[in-house]
């Protein structure tokens, strides 16, 4: 049986708030990662030399982040719209939405942190060669990652950082 119009409107209002919160947090995660990379891997002389190019650079990065996050939110919106034809599906999507958003946000944060570490080692952002690591001796690669990077601290920091969005989504 299809959900009532009032139920649809009420649930969609709540979902819109969650999507907006996710959008803001995800853009902030990507922007924060870009800030860390920028200040960690450039010096003051370089920033002075290319000062006129910084605003367009930041704008281009922001627009890219907005595009990626908006496409991600669009997938959640599409699922919610398709679920409107069934009361059970609508309720299930409403219950699962925040967990899906939190999982994707955690993935974005983990990829951002991974990209910062990857850049620190290889002096370039993630590229197709990062996937080539699987073709190498995976055990040796994982051993190197485990010994050279603060994996446990990064996971603990990510888990702690996700407490804030989890709390915000729970409100």
Please state what every model-predicted region is.
Residues 2-14:
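Short, Lys/Arg-rich, polar N-terminal cytosolic tail immediately upstream
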Residues 11-24, 92-106:
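Alpha-helical transmembrane segments and their helix-start/interface "positive-inside/aromatic belt" motifs
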Residues 19, 23-27, 31, 61, ...:
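Alpha-helical transmembrane spans of integral membrane proteins, capturing the lipid-embedded, hydrophobic core
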Residues 33-64, 100-157:
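Membrane-interfacial interhelical loops
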Residues 44-48, 72, 92:
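Solvent-exposed, low-complexity, intrinsically disordered
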Residues 51, 76-82:
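Feature captures the catalytic ectodomains and active-site-proximal regions of enzymes
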Residues 82-100, 171:
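Cytoplasmic juxtamembrane regions at transmembrane-helix boundaries
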Residues 86-87, 159-171:
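Cytosolic-side transmembrane helix boundary signature
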């Amino acid at each position: 049986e299809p959900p009532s119009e009032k139920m649809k409107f009420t649930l969609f209002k709540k979902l819109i708030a969650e999507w907006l919160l996710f959008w803001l947090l995800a853009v902030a995660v990507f922007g924060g990662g870009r800030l860390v990379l920028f200040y960690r891997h450039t010096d003051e002389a370089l920033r002075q030399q290319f000062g006129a190019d910084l605003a367009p650079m930041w704008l281009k990065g922001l627009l890219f982040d907005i595009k990626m996050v908006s496409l991600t939110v669009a997938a959640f919106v599409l699922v919610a719209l398709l679920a409107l034809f069934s009361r059970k599906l609508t309720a299930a999507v409403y219950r699962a939405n925040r967990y899906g958003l939190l999982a994707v946000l955690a993935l974005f944060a983990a990829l951002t942190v991974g990209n910062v570490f990857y850049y620190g080692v290889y002096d370039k952002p993630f590229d197709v060669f990062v996937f080539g690591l699987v073709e190498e001796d995976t055990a040796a690669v994982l051993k190197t990652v485990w010994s050279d990077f603060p994996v446990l601290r990064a996971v603990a920091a990510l888990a702690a950082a996700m407490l804030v969005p989890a709390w915000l989504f729970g409100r």
